[in-house]
């Protein structure tokens, strides 16, 4: 079974992604911040990472940079930002 790491701090989005992916036959793990994401990443292999940009502790860019130093696992960056700053 392919495993996907969901890194998202919003509980509703976590649940939506987890439910959709598990219903499609994927195994999932959920991290609510950048530190938890790195801990899970080091603890078990994943086939894909869905990574929110805006996270507590370490943002998505920082997490991506640290993972890229060790792995070429595919990463899809997500954001709920909808306006211009």
Language model regions located:
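N-terminal/domain-start alpha-helical segments
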Residues: 1-85
């Amino acid at each position: 079974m392919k495993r996907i790491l969901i890194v998202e701090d919003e509980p509703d989005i976590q649940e939506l992604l987890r439910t959709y992916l598990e219903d499609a036959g994927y195994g999932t793990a959920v991290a609510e911040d950048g530190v938890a994401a790195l801990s899970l990443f080091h603890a078990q292999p994943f086939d894909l990472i869905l990574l929110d940009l805006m996270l507590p502790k370490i943002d998505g860019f920082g997490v991506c940079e640290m993972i890229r130093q060790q792995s070429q696992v595919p990463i899809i960056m997500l954001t709920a930002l909808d306006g211009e700053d």
